[in-house]
């Protein structure tokens, strides 16, 4: 990796299939690397997800959110790779991507889920059945800071496994 910021690692462990995933900020892009047995996995190295704001910007938080690994969809393929993509512009919309182990799009996830008007993201998403329907949801947190004065807010999102919004709620932090 040649990026200037690297997320915390996530480990995919399913029988003999074991890989380490990291996201990297490199040249204004978010890239994902997969490593198995010390070598890069060709379908992931790197997988360019898209543009993001420079995490070294002093006006932003200095962390990349980590990848989450969980059984998100109804596919029988096992666990999926949840990639949080911070906003491409300051105050823009962050996104969530869900991939299969081989780097393809997971069922119902052939495009990103945009966290509209949510702002920046630096917290790692969590996955679990938070509404009791038997299906996993992706829980993400975004925030907006206007830079001066009041108006900072945090939004908690619950995204269904089928790429639809379960719920969102926003908290004013002023």
Which ranges hold each PLM region?
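Repeat-based blade/solenoid architectures
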Residues: 1-8, 51-66, 114-125, 172-174
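Beta-strand initiation motifs
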Residues: 38-47, 104-110, 162-168
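A short loop-to-beta-strand structural motif that recurs across blades of beta-propeller domains
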Residues: 29-33, 94-97, 152-157
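Inter-blade boundary loops/turns of WD-repeat beta-propellers
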Residues: 35-37, 72, 101-103, 130, ...
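Short glycine/acidic-enriched loop and turn motifs that connect beta-strands
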Residues: 24-29, 86-91, 143-149
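Beta-propeller blade termini
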Residues: 7-14, 19, 65-74, 80, ...
């Amino acid at each position: 990796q040649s990026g200037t910021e690297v997320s915390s690692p996530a480990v995919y462990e399913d029988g003999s299939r074991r890989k380490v995933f990291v996201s990297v900020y490199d040249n204004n892009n978010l890239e994902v690397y997969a490593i198995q047995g010390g070598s890069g996995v060709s379908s992931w190295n790197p997988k360019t997800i898209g543009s993001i704001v420079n995490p070294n910007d002093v006006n932003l938080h200095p962390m990349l959110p980590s990848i989450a690994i969980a059984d998100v969809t109804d596919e029988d393929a096992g666990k999926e790779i949840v990639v949080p993509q911070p906003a491409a512009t300051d105050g823009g919309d962050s996104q969530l991507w869900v991939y299969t182990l081989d780097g393809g799009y997971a069922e119902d996830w052939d495009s990103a889920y945009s966290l509209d008007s949510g702002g920046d993201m630096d917290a790692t998403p969590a996955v679990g059945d938070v509404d009791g329907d038997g299906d996993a949801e992706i829980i993400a947190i975004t925030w907006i800071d206007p830079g001066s004065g009041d108006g900072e807010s945090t939004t908690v999102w619950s995204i269904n496994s089928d790429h639809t919004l379960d719920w969102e709620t926003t908290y004013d932090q002023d």
